[in-house]
């Protein structure tokens, strides 16, 4: 599997010099593409436009970016610091709270992937001690430690009951809970987002109480602690469990450096590692930018979104660790094809043309290319070649033919696109339930995640392929639903203005007569419910294989990425209006400056 996934040790040593060589089978070139073939129709058709702006990222500029703080010297320094951090984890003299805070810092600083075994061993030990002692949080000083332990254990797949908060819940319900420990309240708030549907007290008591207390704190003009106030604002804006990990790492590095008790070794290790990982991401980005330019799709199809950087940004949210560069590159190609085909169905194609394209994808027969309108031929040929190429790589190195499953995922996607196109063309207004039955697939998450499974898994299971292909993996449906609803909340005003099919908010309004505000609140609650379901899926994940846990984490990361991308509007289609440009700049372009004399 060395060709598909280079070992982490090799990546760490050669982040700047290694170039992936993605071997592809011979490309099929249809003769009809080598000559000008006019469309059969002579009727001038009225085509819609998405009014998308050109890419804010110039190809030549992307090829020029580099991180000057990620040289071989920095790699050596990082590895020295890594040993020091490992000794902190191995220190048996640390208290329970010190252990928990160190793990939390490593995770938020984006370096926990170096210490997965050590972290799992520590959490396993803490979980066993918790089970033996059967203790509950009944003191103010325990609030932060208990909340943090609950969140970290559940996040890592350990089964922990909400009953450890029973004493505090009783005090909240009787209005006798008094505390000035805002850090403990923030930890309690963050812990509440690891809830499942059965955790009624986390939902109905702890989360509303903690949210109210944090709001009072940030609204208090007498609050002097700027560090804690920023932390509180950040939590209220979006809980940590729902945030895109890598973007939050960039925020937390700056926040951690301002802490009065920050650890100098830890912050320098995190900053150097961030730059080294960023350098790996920059090489990925250059590769996919070259690929995108070589497809000529933006020249041939000027109506589609030119968003290769944004498509790569999604993959960093999906899996950021440097050793997974091959996966990020493949998934960026998948994302770019999804975006292109979505625009053909959403904006440009007539129903007759879209039915032809759907049939072509279902049959997967490149010899029928001439039946398509000319503007669709290049798109289908690139889809055909790329998916067959991915399947060929997997067959060579993993000894299983996944092409039937991959092509089915594209056929399913195109069929749902076609349903929405028919709804729009015919002015049909579906109920929310009918809309969601189609929309959780049309948002492309099932297509994305089956490709991710195939390139990520060392041992591909036919049973897993079947359940993914037949849309029977519940965590995929939950992730897809969050993606769909977040997309609807962020994009529906723009899409409705150009005349698209109703989205979830409008379906609910049309069906119930609710106001837009109430409808949006309902959609937000649907998102929260899906997170509860995903939390249930991972509640006992510590008993699963690392690859199984990795797939579930990727599904959750896709949901996290969607809430990042659509947090301030359409961050994918209109990145200039939704903070995407600034976020990409901070993650993929701008390095973190280093003080070479700081460590002495």
From Swiss-Prot:
GO terms for biological process: diterpenoid biosynthetic process. Gene3D superfamilies: Farnesyl Diphosphate Synthase, Terpene synthase, N-terminal domain. Mg(2+) 1 binds at residues 342, 346. The keyword Manganese applies. Its EC number is 4.2.3.108. Its cofactor is Mg(2+); Mn(2+). Optimum pH is 8.0. Induction: Not induces in aerial parts by treatments with jasmonic acid, 6-ethyl indanoyl-L-Ile, fungal peptaibol elicitor alamethicin or herbivory. Its main location: plastid. Predominantly expressed in roots and at much lower levels in siliques. Not found in leaves, flowers or stems. Also detected in flowers in cv. Landsberg erecta. Not expressed in root apical meristem and elongation zone. Found in the vascular system of young roots and additionally in the cortex and epidermal cell layer of older roots. Binds 3 Mg(2+) or Mn(2+) ions per subunit. SUPFAM superfamilies: Terpenoid cyclases/Protein prenyltransferases (SSF48239), Terpenoid synthases (SSF48576). It is found in: Plastid, Chloroplast. Pathway: Secondary metabolite biosynthesis; terpenoid biosynthesis. A motif (DDXXD motif) lies at residues 342-346. The keyword rRNA processing does not apply. Mg(2+) 2 binds at residues 342, 346. GO terms for cellular component: chloroplast. Involved in monoterpene (C10) biosynthesis. The major product is 1,8-cineole (52%) followed by minor amounts of sabinene (14.5%), myrcene (13.3%), (-)-(1S)-beta-pinene (7.8%), (-)-(4S)-limonene (4.0%), (E)-beta-ocimene (2.7%), alpha-terpineol (2.4%), (-)-(1S)-alpha-pinene (1.9%), terpinolene (0.8%), and (+)-alpha-thujene (0.6%). This is 1,8-cineole synthase 2, chloroplastic.
